[in-house]
Structure formats: structure tokens, C-alpha cells
Amino acid sequence: MNDPSLLGYPNVGPQQQQQQQQQQHAGLLGKGTPNALQQQLHMNQLTGIPPPGLMNNSDVHTSSNNNSRQLLDQLANGNANMLNMNMDNNNNNNNNNNNNNNNGGGSGVMMNASTAAVNSIGMVPTVGTPVNINVNASNPLLHPHLDDPSLLNNPIWKLQLHLAAVSAQSLGQPNIYARQNAMKKYLATQQAQQAQQQAQQQAQQQVPGPFGPGPQAAPPALQPTDFQQSHIAEASKSLVDCTKQALMEMADTLTDSKTAKKQQPTGDSTPSGTATNSAVSTPLTPKIELFANGKDEANQALLQHKKLSQYSIDEDDDIENRMVMPKDSKYDDQLWHALDLSNLQIFNISANIFKYDFLTRLYLNGNSLTELPAEIKNLSNLRVLDLSHNRLTSLPAELGSCFQLKYFYFFDNMVTTLPWEFGNLCNLQFLGVEGNPLEKQFLKILTEKSVTGLIFYLRDNRPEIPLPHERRFIEINTDGEPQREYDSLQQSTEHLATDLAKRTFTVLSYNTLCQHYATPKMYRYTPSWALSWDYRRNKLKEQILSYDSDLLCLQEVESKTFEEYWVPLLDKHGYTGIFHAKARAKTMHSKDSKKVDGCCIFFKRDQFKLITKDAMDFSGAWMKHKKFQRTEDYLNRAMNKDNVALFLKLQHIPSGDTIWAVTTHLHWDPKFNDVKTFQVGVLLDHLETLLKEETSHNFRQDIKKFPVLICGDFNSYINSAVYELINTGRVQIHQEGNGRDFGYMSEKNFSHNLALKSSYNCIGELPFTNFTPSFTDVIDYIWFSTHALRVRGLLGEVDPEYVSKFIGFPNDKFPSDHIPLLARFEFMKTNTGSKKV
């Protein structure tokens, strides 16, 4: 019953037993029983009672399941005994703890001086630290600073050693993170009570009674002193807390050294004894990582704000999630987001854990795990993962899918290499590798360029992932059902009947990702060479020309790129193009306006003839509308958006039928979904006006029967108000537009008289059209008039197995974060108003 291993602590090895006997003879330890030893190590030396979350002596004889009850009892009973502390006894116990710590083995590194306060609380590693750590303590393969002492002067490796030592202190404490969190809540409660009592005391002193000042307030309940609180606060610091603090200090040191270097008079040389680590990057920002020797013109206030937000885990992430996840689900719907299974001697992990995809923190340190299941990829919301002090020999490549990881520790394992997929961990702030026989190449990059440089190396040098096959083309029959699949669009065209070929045409819609938006900061998961505009532009050319589509509707095309690249290129392949830039180009100088993106339509000259064209920006067009009203929502939310639409009336040469082709790109921000609905309402209203003008000579022709295509990036889900409006003809009640007033548009429920349907609806839409780490969904569509056109073929999905190996596009095969949509349409024989060319 006295064996500490029964409490979840490692057994005391022969070496430790011999050390204990020597210490007993020297008077450094009390009675040599493991029970007495446990009491000395885990009792609060300040007060005689353990802090919240730490095991007391009575727990040795009780079930380990009583830990939670013991924690609640301590929190409920308060702190009445805090004043009964004996400072002399505290100092003696501190000395005992330090002796135990020095003789108890460890991770092969020295504990820093700041751990003295932690030791006084009892948060020290047990004497019975696993034997394998002692065996490897002097192994230079696991601790490279033993082989290369210069690493001890490297700030990045010093941080590794410091945090490895902090991690080693948690050994022997089951659920250490949960216990530390309980201590934080305990301190917060105590501080709140103190503040409340002080406020009440001041209020009673200030309010006079009928016979002068009121009676003196009763003395507050016994509270821990500031000295005691500071020690408990130090003990409650988790490994993550220490990491944040250390990273902040490193950032401050780097900033101070740069400032001092700038202020140094010209001609003064740096003393030889002073190290200027200007070439040593820190995990601050990609800019600092890649351009460590460049000029730093950042404002100090902005830098501080960036530092504060970069190292936090939940506060800023909640805001980010709300920005990119406009669905009904909320981050706070889940009451807990952390799972602490630390120091429980677990050998295997239940598969059910990986169903908890809401987890942001997972603590598996101090166990006996030999492998981590590939299902870890399901936990894509993880910010913190601690695998330290296990028996892992490798890390799964699937862990690279946890792209939101900020703090990842695997101290003291037997991992020799890192998967290339770790290049996806673009948000990583710290990677704890000390105590592993890691490849020297990776260690060299880590110590020279920090974790960011290591991640970028893995990202940029990842071996090519072959695409098993191109996207297949799905043939659709006259009933709107999939009939057959072809390996390519060209193969499908070869099997197309001659009479059907005369009545059909193909259209491609593609958001090409403007080069001004494809920044390294926004797409950190994309290899730098694959993100370069020269590479992406060449891949876009190959992709677009390979489909040989009759109509090309492109979004996010820069004005200059349209004029100098796409027009000359596509002209050689028989295309004519029309372009319309976003509205802000009108207010800019000619040179700057060339950098503004917009929408364009290219058509094959042997397939189509241009009859007329029109273009609009939604805000400007609505202000000219005869029923325009200056509502508050329009002025504050919609008027400053510069999105546009382009309209072309074309005649299909083989069949003689006419068609309106429209392309647009709606506003992106999910916080303005009501504005997107308004923009679509304006687009459809304008299109109806154009159709009525064209058919004014023929009152019998219904505008529903006029062939219409509307292609583009609508930035809207299938369950959005935009989709409902286009698909059903109106939006009566939808949460995205509730309470918003856009005047006439809102009064008529944004209704229109066209019969439109999504072309991909016949196959249930694609799995996604936009693929990024934080967002993967369908937001691009090709809408067609159901009374005049019929879908006869669709370009299918990207191979799912290939997609599963990435966290987002662009990459070496797909040059945009969107994928192109392609459909074949047939003019229906019921279409009227046709005229042979």
C-alpha cells in the first residue's frame, strides 16, 4: 500500500533507493518509507495542506477515484489554515525538495532557478522517475547539446532545455494540467473575494450613520498573503503558460537588441563579449523569420498587439472561427474543449477520443504510448498537444492535418524524423523536440531558423504527391440523371452525337485567385514556389486551355493581367474577351487601377457572336434605380462594396440560339450575408430589365424561356439566403436578412421572375468548390434557366484520396484556392426567338 506507483507514480528504482538511504543517513530525509517520501514531495510546504488539485497524504489509503472529490472539498473549505504556516519549516522543506530533485534523475538538463517557487509548493518530479530517462540522460543522440556545447548559447535550444525541464517536473502528477487549471480558478476566486471584501469595507466607511461615521467593517475572512498567492500562482503555471511567457520574453529581447543596434553611434564596434543574435530568428512572424536581417519598421504598439494575439490560444481563435464559420454552430455551444490524460500510464488510446473534434487541447504526456493513431487528423481544432515522456518512435503523417496547432510537445520520446506533412503546421509557435534522437538536419534548421523555418523547410521540400487521375466528366441524360463517366471532357466530346453537338456548348467558371490576394501570410501552407505568380499563372494557362471550353467566365483577374496575358494568349486559341474591373478602379490613377481585379468572359469566335454587352457595380446601379431608397442598411453596409457583374448577349453560331451569359463575384465577408442577398437582388433585377427590353417586341415570349447563364463566386452556402433567392425566386424569412432594410428590395423579398437552377444540383453539388484549411465548402455556382437549357454534362470532383493529403489549395497541381466548374448545356427545342446566323 505504500508503493507510490499505486498512486500513478513510477516505481522507485534501485539507484533511487540507494540515494534515498544515503540521504536518510545524512539527515536529509525523514523516514525512508515511500509513504513518508510522498508526503514530503507532495504536501504544500507553506501551509501543511496541499494546494487545490494536489494529492494529500490521506489519498494514499483511498481510491484514486477520490481525487476529484478531494479537489472539490479543498475548494469548498476555503483557506482558513493558510495563516498557520511556519516559515522555518518551509525553508527546511525547500532544501529537502531541492536535494530530492537533484538526486531523482531527470531529463538530462538542469532545472532553472525559477523552479524554486514551484518546488516550495510541491510541484516537483518524484524520486521514482522512470529509469529509462536516467539511462538516456547522458546520451548525446537524445541531448545534442552534450555533443555540441555551443548549443547551450543558442537561444532557441536554451528554450528547448528550459521547457523540457518544466515538462519533466510534471512527471508523477496524474492530470497535471487539470490540477494546475483548478489552482488558477482557486486563485481567481480568492482574488475576487478579496476585491469584493475591500469594496464592501470602503463602502461602509464612506457611508455615515445618524450618529456619525458607520461602524467599522468586520475584518475580512482569513486570506492567503501575497507571498503565498505568488507561490501558488507559480505552481499553477502549466507548460503552455511557461512557453507563452518565454516566447514573449524572446520577442522582447530581439526587439530590444534591434533598437539598441539602431541607436548605436556609427563607427562603434560591438564588444566581442556581447552576442548580437540578429541572425537568429524567433517564432514571431513570417516576415521576421524570412527576413531576419531586414529593416524592421513596425510600430511598437502594433508589434505588441501582434505578439499578444499570436501566442494566445482560445481568445483570438474564437473570433477567427466566427469570421470563417458563419453557420449556425457556435464555438461556445461546446462546454469543454480540453482533455487531460497526463501521467496515467496509458498504453493505448481509445478511438472514441478522436470523435471529439471540438477539442482544442489534448494532454497525453507521461504515459506509455508507443504509437499515435492516424485518426488524430480528425482533431483539426487542436491548438495544444503534449505527447512528452512516452515511448513514441515515430509521429503519424496525419498529424499534419491539425493545422491549427500552436504548441506541440514530444519531449523525451524516441522520434528520429518528422513527416513532410508537418509543413502544414503553419500556425505552430513552439515544437518541443528535446530528448529525441532527431535527425541532425532538422535540428540544425530548428536551431538556426526556429520552428517557422523548420516548418517552411518541410513545406517547400515535400515530395510530390501524384494526382491519381484528372477530374472525370459526368454525362447527364435528358432526365437530368448521371448516365456515364468519361476520363476527360475531350473523351466525352468524341462520343457526342453530331446533331446533339450542334445544340450544345460548354461553359467554365473559375475564380483564379488574383496574385495580389495570394500572399505568403494568407497561404502559409502553400509551398513558396507553388504560390509564386509565375508558377500559378502557367498552371492556370495549362488548366484552362486543357478544358477547351466554349465559354470562359473568370473571376479575380487583374486588369493588367487580362490585357497583357490572357487576351494575347487566348486570342491565339480563338477567343475574344470582355472585362469589367471592380468599382474602385474608377477612383484610382491609371497606373494603380491596372492592379484592380474584376470579372471577364471569353467566348470562342467560331461558336459565339457578340450581340450586346453590359456591366454594373451593384451600389452604383441601385442608386440609379427608379425605386431607389436611401436606407440606413444600404448606406452603412452595401454602398461601399465594389463588387461587379458582367452581362453578354451572345448568339450560338451552330444553332442560332441566343443566350445571356453573366458572371459575378459577390462580397466575401460572412458578416455581410445580407449584402450578398441584396447584390444578387440587384443583379437579377437588372437582368430582368435587359430581358424585357430585348423581348419588348414579342410580348408572348416569357422571360423564363430566355436562355440565361449566371456563373461566378457567390461566397454563399447551399443553405444561404442567396441560394434560396436564386433557386426559389424569393427570400421570405431567412436569418441572414432578418431586421435589414434595403428599401424596395426588402419590400418585395428580393423576388425575381426567372426560373433558375444550379447546374450541379443534378449530382447533389460537389464536395467543395473552395478548399482552404479554415473553410471547405461549395460557394461557386453555374445557374441556368430551366425552361430554355438542359444540363448534359458536368466536370466531377477532385480525387478524394488526393484531397485528403492536403489541408488546402493552392498547391503544385491546383493553382487557386477554388476549383473550376464546367458544364455542358443543350438548347431546348421549346426555346423561341432563335435566329439563324
Curated annotation (Swiss-Prot):
Entry keyword annotation includes Cell membrane: no
Domain of life according to the entry: Eukaryota
Impact after mutating residue 780 to A: Reduces activity
Signal sequence, renumbered to the chain: none
GO cellular component: CCR4-NOT core complex; Cdc73/Paf1 complex; cytoplasm; P-body
Positions contributing to Mg(2+) binding: 556
EC supergroup of this enzyme: hydrolase
Region entry Disordered, spans: 1-32, 46-66, 81-107, 197-223, 254-281
Sites bearing Phosphothreonine, chain numbering: 33, 285
Coiled coil: none
Low complexity: compositionally biased ranges: 15-24, 81-102, 197-209
Family classification: Belongs to the CCR4/nocturin family.
Subunit structure: Subunit of the 1.0 MDa CCR4-NOT core complex that contains CCR4, CAF1, NOT1, NOT2, NOT3, NOT4, NOT5, CAF40 and CAF130. In the complex interacts with NOT1. The core complex probably is part of a less characterized 1.9 MDa CCR4-NOT complex.
Function description: Acts as a catalytic component of the CCR4-NOT core complex, which in the nucleus seems to be a general transcription factor, and in the cytoplasm the major mRNA deadenylase involved in mRNA turnover. CCR4 has 3'-5' RNase activity with a strong preference for polyadenylated substrates and also low exonuclease activity towards single-stranded DNA. Discovered because of its role in the control of ADH2 gene expression. It is required for the expression of genes involved in non-fermentative growth and it mediates or is required for the action of the SPT6 and SPT10 genes.
The name this protein goes by in its record: CCR4-Not complex 3'-5'-exoribonuclease subunit Ccr4
Source organism: Saccharomyces cerevisiae (strain ATCC 204508 / S288c) (Baker's yeast)
Species classification: Eukaryota, Fungi, Dikarya, Ascomycota, Saccharomycotina
